[in-house]
């Protein structure tokens, strides 16, 4: 594969083929759980957009799709712990089964905030789905209902995950070389 981003990747953690297979498994699991319930898939922007697109195609449910933009990173590599909504959803979720789709469950600050936020808005249920789970970095007591892969405490990019808005289009999950993001 030819890519000007390849030189910045230390190693591949999850291949394209592994992503495709696991996302299909996740889609099948969501189909079993939500068949006939018209869930609302909520993509946490920007990182989850690639995963979300593949996931909703994999599960083949009648469903709605929404997007929310939040921020919790003061700089490019560390969460501030404070979550701010930059773009809220447009639909009323009262009585809806909400599936929050995130790229990575890291500190847990964003997902803990979103879960509480949407419970107060009357969601019938909230299911947290994350492509990557990094439990070694958890600050909040929150877990995903469905996780694609557990990853080590390394800086990962690709398949929607970025560093300074770059590398989202890398078609696999890779570890970024430390010299790329070192101050």
Protein language model features and the residues they cover:
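PRPP-associated nucleotide enzymes
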Residues: 1-183
């Amino acid at each position: 594969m030819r890519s000007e981003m390849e030189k910045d990747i230390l190693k591949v953690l999850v291949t394209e083929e592994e992503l495709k297979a696991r996302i299909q498994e996740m889609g099948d699991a969501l189909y079993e759980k939500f068949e006939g319930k018209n869930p609302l898939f909520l993509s946490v922007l920007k990182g989850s957009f690639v995963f979300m697109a593949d996931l909703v195609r994999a599960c083949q449910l009648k469903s709605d799709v929404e997007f929310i933009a939040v921020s919790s990173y003061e700089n490019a590599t560390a969460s501030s712990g404070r979550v701010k909504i930059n773009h809220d959803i447009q639909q009323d979720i009262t009585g809806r089964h909400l599936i929050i789709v995130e790229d990575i469950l890291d500190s847990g600050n964003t997902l803990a905030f979103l879960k509480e936020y949407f419970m107060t808005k009357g969601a019938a249920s909230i299911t947290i789905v994350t492509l990557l789970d990094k439990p070694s970095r958890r600050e909040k007591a929150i877990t995903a209902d469905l996780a694609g892969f557990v990853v080590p405490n390394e800086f990962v990019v690709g398949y929607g995950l970025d560093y300074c808005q770059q590398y989202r289009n890398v078609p696999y999950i890779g570890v970024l070389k430390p010299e790329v993001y070192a101050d």
